[in-house]
Amino acid sequence: MSDNPTIAPKIVVVGAGAFGTALAAVAAASANANVTLLSRREEVAEECRRTGRNERALPGIALPAGLGFSSEAAALAGADIVLFAMPSQEHRAAAQQYGTAIGADATIVTCAKGMEQSTGRLLTELLAEELPGHRIGVLSGPGFAADIAKGLPTAMVVAAPDMAVATELAEALSGPTFRLYPSTDRIGVQLGGALKNVLAIACGIVEGAGLGDSARAALISRGLAEMSRFIAARGGEADTVRGLSGLGDLVLTATSHQSRNLRFGIALGKNGRADGRGAELVEGAFAASVAARVAGDLGIEMPITEAVAAIIDGKLDVRTALEQLMSRPITQE
């Protein structure tokens, strides 16, 4: 990032989906940065330039006049901050595609909530492999794209290797209606974002199956315990789960029908079993199988996550999974 605080940082958001567009809009609206939204498709960039909107991703929302649009990797030249806002499973390919265009001094921030399915890598780990030498951060927490883009009050977390970098990122990306809290727990912040998607699917299953609000409350509370164990086992801070990137994001995603993960779970609950449709569209479907596999390798128990993974994979139906969860040995909370 720029060493001169009087110079507005250059920010490039890679990925013109709903969340990337929203982040670019809120950063541009703050008037404290030079912001470009980089789409991998020229027709999307051209539509945004021509109409001042991204109707494919955020219909009906006008974008700030100062926001730039591009489909060329050259837009990354001189960027101080690069936000990777594409889905988690596309991060490695994007890093390989754009890596040579990103300057050595740029700080790279992943804004996706997942893990790489094939390796179980956290996205910061993946980016560090593909883009060595860069400072790598993560932005996560409870924020729907439409809310952010509409200027509704939203608070999230940005984590980086040290607090100075995290604070710089928070100051550069925050605006009047968008507040970022700095953190150094990249592991905890990432896993909170990834695992809450799995638990949102579980809560959706409960809702779709008509199992009641008490069951949802149990899933949220016991799910937080699973998240805490997993974060600690992966080297993060267990207490991070109590903050915005853990509890905050879980409550939002597990209770709002804006959540794709919740809606996917509701469909599973209504059907009673997986039907092979929709799993490729939700981050939680990838995270469930990865987290269950890694938990086994780490020797930690994650029964809710394992049940969700088994339901999505078609190995269990909802009723059998519920019976197995409810018949587990009684232990102290």
Curated annotation (Swiss-Prot):
Pathway: Membrane lipid metabolism; glycerophospholipid metabolism. It is an enzyme of class 1 (oxidoreductase). Keywords: Cytoplasm, Lipid biosynthesis, Lipid metabolism, NAD, NADP, Nucleotide-binding, Oxidoreductase, Phospholipid biosynthesis, Phospholipid metabolism. GO terms for cellular component: cytosol. It holds the Pfam family NAD_Gly3P_dh_N. Its main location: cytoplasm. NADPH binds at residues 19, 40-41, 113, 145, 260, 282-283. GO terms for molecular function: glycerol-3-phosphate dehydrogenase [NAD(P)+] activity; NAD binding. It catalyses: sn-glycerol 3-phosphate + NAD(+) = dihydroxyacetone phosphate + NADH + H(+); sn-glycerol 3-phosphate + NADP(+) = dihydroxyacetone phosphate + NADPH + H(+). The active site is at 196 (proton acceptor). Sn-glycerol 3-phosphate binds at residues 113, 141, 196, 249, 259-261. Belongs to the NAD-dependent glycerol-3-phosphate dehydrogenase family. Catalyzes the reduction of the glycolytic intermediate dihydroxyacetone phosphate (DHAP) to sn-glycerol 3-phosphate (G3P), the key precursor for phospholipid synthesis. This is Glycerol-3-phosphate dehydrogenase [NAD(P)+]. It comes from Sinorhizobium fredii (strain NBRC 101917 / NGR234).
